[in-house]
């Protein structure tokens, strides 16, 4: 990781999470790449005011992106997620938009919907609806959104601990007590959260 200033995000991050096989599911490896490519300065010539690289050539992209673009003959863009499977790939944009399939015929028919969605309903409104009618959970249900949020937050804490393997038990890092300091914010006097 390359750092900006204390308390800031990293200039560039590469993180890998490994999830073991469980309850009828295969093991999964998740790799996260962001920020500027190693060696590219983090300055106004290379990065805009909200931290987005001005050119794709400056981005810290996974090495496999160019290989997949050549294989499937289409651009995968520079922001979003790529799911690599045995039959091909699916790429989604940073907001769940811009689906790209490789090979293109991978997308033959729409899969069944697994989670109910309210058209035109934003997250806070959907959350309030679920409070009023608990028989139908939120579209962004805590059953999967809480583990997802934990994964992302661990991705923020891990680079601060340095380049190493960290083991997580659901509450703390079990193999590095020093890394646990990054799991909670230290507030200035008068700004503490109560309770």
Task: Mark where each language-model region is.
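Glycine-rich, aromatic-lined ligand/substrate-binding cores of catalytic
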Residues: 1-138, 149-170, 175-182, 186-195
């Amino acid at each position: 990781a390359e750092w900006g200033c204390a308390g800031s995000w990293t200039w560039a991050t590469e993180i890998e999470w490994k999830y073991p096989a469980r309850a009828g599911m295969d093991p999964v490896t998740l790799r996260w790449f962001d920020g500027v490519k190693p060696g590219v300065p983090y300055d106004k010539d290379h990065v805009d005011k909200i931290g987005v690289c001005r050119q794709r050539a400056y981005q810290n992209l996974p090495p496999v992106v160019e290989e997949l673009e050549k294989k499937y003959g289409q651009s995968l863009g520079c922001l979003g997620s790529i799911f690599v499977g045995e039959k091909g790939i699916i790429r989604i944009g940073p907001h769940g938009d811009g689906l790209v399939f490789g090979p293109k015929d991978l997308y033959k028919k729409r899969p069944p919907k697994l989670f109910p969605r309210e058209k035109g309903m934003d997250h806070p409104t959907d959350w309030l609806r679920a409070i009023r009618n608990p028989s139908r959970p939120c579209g962004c249900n805590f059953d999967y959104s809480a583990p997802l949020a934990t994964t992302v937050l661990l991705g923020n804490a891990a680079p601060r601990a340095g380049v190493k393997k960290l083991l997580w038990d659901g509450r703390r890092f079990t193999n590095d007590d020093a890394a646990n300091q990054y799991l909670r914010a230290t507030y200035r006097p008068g700004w503490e959260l109560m309770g």
